Amino acid sequence: MTKVLVLWADTRSANFGVQVLARGLAELATRAWGPETVVEFQNYMPGDSPVSFTTRSIARDVGRRSGPIKTKLREYDIILDSGAGDSFTDIYGLKRHAFMVYASRSAAKLGIPVALGPQTIGPFTTAVGRRGGRYCLDRASVVQSRDDVSAEYSATLGRPVDARATDVVFALPRTEVPTSRDVVVNVSGLLWFSDRHGDSAGYRNSVRSLLGELRSAGRQVSLLAHVVDAVSVDDDAAAIRDLDSESRSGLEVVVPRTLDEVRNTVGSAEWVVGARMHACLNALSMGTPAIPWAYSRKFVPLMSDLGWDLSVDLAHEQNPGEVTAQVITTRKGADVGDQVKGVHDLADERLDAAVASLQTVGTR
C-alpha cells in the first residue's frame, strides 16, 4: 500500500480552489498507484493535518533529525507537491516560496521522492527565487505543468517537464445538474478589497457594469462566493455583501459550504463569470461555459491549451463588463457546448499523461 502526502492543499480550506487541488490530486494519485493508495494532505497551516509547515515549524525542524516537518514527511512513501496551484513562484513573496523549498529539501534529505503535480511554474523574478525554483525542479522525480507556458519556463530553468497536463479540477467526477440558473457571477474579494493584483476600484466598477449590462439584456444573475472565510480580507462573501448593500439588487446570493455545493451551483448555470480561476474551471469541468476575468499569467495559457478562448484580460480590457455581457448575449448555445466538450476531451488526454508520468515515480 502506497502512502502519499499532497502538499499545499487541504479539503477544509476556506478557498474552494484549494479544496479542488486536494481532491483532484487524490484522484490522480489513486489512478496512478491504485485504489488502495492512502492520500493525506498538508497545507501551510493546520487543517486536515495538525501540523503547520510555516516559520515556527521550520525553526523547530532545522538541524534536527526528528523535527515536526521531517517527522511528518517520514510517514509517506511519496510527496505529491501541488504548488498550491499557482504558488511555485516568488511573486507572492520569498517567505511562501521558502516554505516550499524547505519541504522539498527535507524530503530530499530523507530520500522520499517528490512529484510536482500539475501546476503553474514560475515566474521567478529574483535571483534567490530562481535558485529555489531550480533546486525544487532538479530534485523532483516528476515535474508536471498545467499549461504550456509553464512547461517552457521550466525548460529555461534546466528541467523539462515530464508531462504537459492541465488543472486537476478535470479529474473530479462530472455529474449532470439540471439548468436552473442563468448567469452566475463570482465576485472576488481578492480584487474587490485590495490593489495587490490590479486596480480594486476599476474591478468594482467593472462588476457593477457587468450586472447593469446583464439586467438591461434581461438576464437573471446569481452571485457566487468561491472563497468563504470571515477572517480573511480576501473573503468573496464580504465582497458580495458590500456590493449588495450598495446596489440593493435583491439578486440571489450563493455562499456555499462545500465544494460539491460550488460545483452544483456552477453546473446549474447557463454561464459563469468570475475572477477566481477555479470558479471558472469548476464550471467548465461541469459542462458550463465560463468567462474568466484574468488578472494574472495563470489564466490564459491554461485556458488556451484547452482550446477555450473566452476570457477577459482585466489589465488591458477597458470595458470588461460590456465585453462579457456581449459574449453572453451573442454566443449560441450549441456552438459553445461543442467547445466545452472539446475542453473535456483535451483535459482528459492531458491528465492521462499526468497519471502515466506519476506511475514512473520510484522506478527510475
Question: What are these model-derived regions, one by one?
Answer:
Residues 1-364:
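Active-site anion-handling motifs in enzyme catalytic cores
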